[in-house]
């Protein structure tokens, strides 16, 4: 059973860990991690969510997921890239770009850390997790920006523009 650590809104660990999908209580936040991956030739990797996904099935988006109990958001970013796409990310190449809070109810939500990194495409091609990913492609920055910001904040869009110049 996957466990998640519970945090306060300011990112302080409460000492509590709960099973994935446990209903949240007021003042509780889970940690989530996103990784923006730019290839050596300047393309961006984006994935199409599984058609069976609970949230946003079939939509093209960035790679990411929940941070497991005892894991940092940076470790989760590296793990998610490997699990979902088979992409190896050097942890030393990660650049922390943004921390945002998303409310799921009036008094609880998610703390989301976004990282950016240059990556090498897998020599044997992407190995997608069919449970989470339907398809994957590499696209120019403009297409990536337009596609993945449909449900994101202006701060996220601004961060992507900064990341493009940084990585």
Task: Mark where each language-model region is.
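Short glycine/serine/proline-enriched coil/turn segments at secondary-structure junctions
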Residues: 27, 53-54, 104-107
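A glycine-rich, hydrophobic loop/mini-helix early in the fold
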Residues: 32-64
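Acidic, metal-coordinating catalytic segment for phosphate/diphosphate chemistry
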Residues: 1-34, 40
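Nudix hydrolase/Nudix homology domain
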Residues: 21, 57-58, 98-100, 106-167
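The catalytic Nudix box helix
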Residues: 45-46, 62-96
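Short loop segments at secondary-structure junctions
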Residues: 10, 39-42, 50, 118-123, ...
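Residue-level detector of beta-propeller blades
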Residues: 13, 96-97
């Amino acid at each position: 059973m996957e466990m998640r650590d519970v945090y306060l809104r300011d990112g302080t660990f409460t000492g509590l860990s709960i099973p994935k999908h446990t209903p949240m209580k007021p003042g509780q936040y889970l940690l989530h991690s996103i990784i923006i991956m730019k290839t050596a030739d300047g393309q961006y990797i984006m994935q199409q969510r599984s058609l069976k996904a609970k949230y946003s099935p079939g939509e093209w988006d960035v790679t990411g997921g929940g941070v497991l109990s005892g894991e940092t958001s940076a470790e989760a970013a590296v793990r998610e890239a490997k699990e979902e796409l088979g992409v190896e990310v050097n942890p030393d190449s990660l650049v922390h770009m943004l921390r945002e809070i998303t409310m799921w109810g009036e008094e609880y939500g998610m703390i989301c850390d976004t990282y950016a990194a240059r990556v090498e495409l897998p020599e044997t091609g992407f190995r997608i997790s069919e449970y989470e990913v339907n398809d994957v492609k590499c696209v120019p920055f403009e297409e990536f920006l337009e596609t993945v910001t449909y449900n994101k904040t202006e701060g996220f869009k601004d961060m992507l523009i900064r990341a493009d110049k940084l990585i």
